[in-house]
């Protein structure tokens, strides 16, 4: 979006950002006041759906997002009205995860956020979800840059120099598997081992 938006107490008025996340296996929508106060937070998990496959299946995940996206958005608007008297027209900007993540999944949340921005004539803010991992700490702590961060998520393990919440430099990262991927491989191997032991008991 070409619209500019000033966020925070220094802007002189309250800001309400609706953020949509759909990078992997959870469809989430939240509304945050002035960057710190969560007035709505809705998550639709797909854990049970993917458990039978031993991991996230991208095509199934994307379909699940499509089924859940309108539900979580409607619930977020309902929570915002109940908790703070906020209507959809009061939203200052709409944000959506642009990556990294599963392409089909990302598109669901991204299209929803951009559509809402268009309908309500508000700015759209694209968010890198790794950056969001860092910024999320500011919701309930007074953690302010500059600082060094160790980011460990499902697909990334990085050491980051955080100059500000909008400017970070990756100082180092794993060159093959991230810690989360290593955990996943161990879990899959263990599951196969347990299945083999169970089968042996039956013979």
Segments from the language model and where they lie:
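Short glycine-aspartate micro-motif
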Residues: 17-19, 95, 105, 147-151, ...
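Conserved small/polar residues in nucleotide/adenosyl-binding loops
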Residues: 191-198
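Glycine-rich phosphate-binding loop and adjoining helix at the ATP-binding site
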Residues: 90-135
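Conserved phosphate-binding catalytic cores of ATP/NTP-utilizing and phosphoryl-transfer enzymes
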Residues: 6-8, 13, 115, 126-148
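Internal alpha/beta core interface subdomains
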Residues: 177-190
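N-terminal beta-alpha supersecondary unit
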Residues: 13-90, 96, 100, 129, ...
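Short beta-strand scaffold segments in enzyme catalytic cores
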Residues: 27-32, 149, 157-161
């Amino acid at each position: 979006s070409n619209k500019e938006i000033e966020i925070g107490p220094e802007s002189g008025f309250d800001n309400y950002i609706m953020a949509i996340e759909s990078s992997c296996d959870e469809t989430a929508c939240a509304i945050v006041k002035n960057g710190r106060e969560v007035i709505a937070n809705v998550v639709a998990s797909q854990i049970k759906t993917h458990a039978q496959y031993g991991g996230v299946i991208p095509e199934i995940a994307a379909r699940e997002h499509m089924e859940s996206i309108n539900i979580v958005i409607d619930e977020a608007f309902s929570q915002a009205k109940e908790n703070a008297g906020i209507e959809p027209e009061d939203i200052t900007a709409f944000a959506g995860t642009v990556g990294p993540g599963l392409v089909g999944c990302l598109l669901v949340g991204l299209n929803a956020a951009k559509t809402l921005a268009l309908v309500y004539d508000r700015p759209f803010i694209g968010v890198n979800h790794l950056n969001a991992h860092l910024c999320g700490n500011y919701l309930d702590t007074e953690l302010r840059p500059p600082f060094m961060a160790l980011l460990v998520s499902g697909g990334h393990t990085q050491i980051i120099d955080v100059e500000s919440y909008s400017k970070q430099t990756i100082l180092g990262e794993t060159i093959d598997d991230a810690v989360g991927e290593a955990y996943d491989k161990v879990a899959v191997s263990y599951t196969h081992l347990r299945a083999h032991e169970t089968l042996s008991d039956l013979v």
